[in-house]
């Protein structure tokens, strides 16, 4: 059914148990980083999850399709984007498992109960507010640059909202990894697992996945890297296994 679509929107098949997703190409569409994050995050049966800066809600929808988590909450500051996310949730009849909340990450701990969530996920803006060229479209600038929230905001609120030994999952850019790990330790979210994502086996990583645990002891594992493409352009799965040819 497409009666939930607005002008300029499309309905995409997620290839995941019949789930479909509403997007607007002129605004912002989710990328492969969201898929990698949803694969990396470990959600156990019965757990509660908060996705900070959920955008159009892709992470909660993917996690609802991939895991047996009890409930997923997406927090999004842009009202129009949050409304689109709610329509995707309703389209897939996931209202009993996913809630989309319009609100500011910087005030997340005031909106939710302290130490309430088992898991927090985030695909935050990668660029500092003054780094590089901002996209003239505000919605894309907010998604890509730290215009409305910073790494400190995300980690501070996550520290307050995670249960003891609760898990934190984030995808980011490798050039900020030193800052990320330092700040995670400062906010008592100890880095536990790191995985780099390379476009090709002989190229530097372009993304990094990080798992942290609230109140844990220092000990980190480096996972085997994800290689996205073979040299001939063949699309690969995790750790270099062959997948279908890129089209």
PLM segments and residue spans:
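SAM/dcSAM-binding transferase cores
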Residues: 204-247
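Class I SAM-dependent transferase core
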Residues: 2-45
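A generic structural micro-feature
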Residues: 66-67, 113, 202-206, 220
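General small-molecule cofactor/ligand-binding pocket signal
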Residues: 22, 99-101, 192-195
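Conserved Class I SAM-dependent methyltransferase catalytic core
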Residues: 148-199, 203-205
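Mobile active-site "lid"/loop adjacent to the S-adenosyl-L-methionine
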Residues: 124-153
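A generic structural signal for alpha->beta connector loops
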Residues: 18, 46, 69, 95-97, ...
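Conserved SAM/SAH cofactor-binding pocket of Class I
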Residues: 40-133, 156
């Amino acid at each position: 059914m497409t009666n939930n679509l607005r002008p300029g929107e499309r309905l995409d098949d997620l290839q995941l148990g019949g789930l479909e997703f509403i997007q607007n190409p002129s605004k912002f569409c989710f990328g492969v980083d969201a898929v990698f994050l949803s694969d990396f995050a470990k959600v156990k049966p019965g757990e509660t999850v908060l996705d900070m800066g959920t955008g159009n809600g892709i992470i909660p929808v993917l996690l609802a399709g991939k895991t047996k988590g009890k409930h997923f909450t997406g927090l999004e500051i842009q009202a129009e984007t949050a409304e689109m996310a709610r329509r995707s949730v309703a389209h897939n009849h996931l209202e009993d498992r996913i809630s989309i909340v319009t609100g500011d990450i910087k005030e997340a701990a005031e909106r939710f109960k302290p130490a309430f969530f088992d898991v927090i996920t985030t695909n935050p803006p990668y660029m500092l507010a003054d780094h590089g060229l901002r996209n003239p479209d505000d919605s894309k600038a907010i998604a890509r640059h730290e215009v409305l929230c910073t790494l400190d905001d995300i980690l501070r609120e996550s520290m307050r909202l995670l249960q003891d030994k609760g898990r934190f999952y984030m995808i980011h850019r490798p050039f900020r990894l030193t800052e990320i790990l330092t700040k995670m330790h400062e906010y008592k979210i100890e880095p536990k697992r790191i995985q780099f994502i390379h476009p090709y086996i002989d190229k530097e990583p372009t993304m990094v996945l990080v798992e942290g645990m609230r109140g844990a002891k220092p000990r980190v594992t480096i996972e085997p890297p994800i290689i996205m493409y073979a040299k001939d352009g063949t699309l690969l799965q995790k750790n270099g296994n062959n997948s279908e040819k890129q089209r």
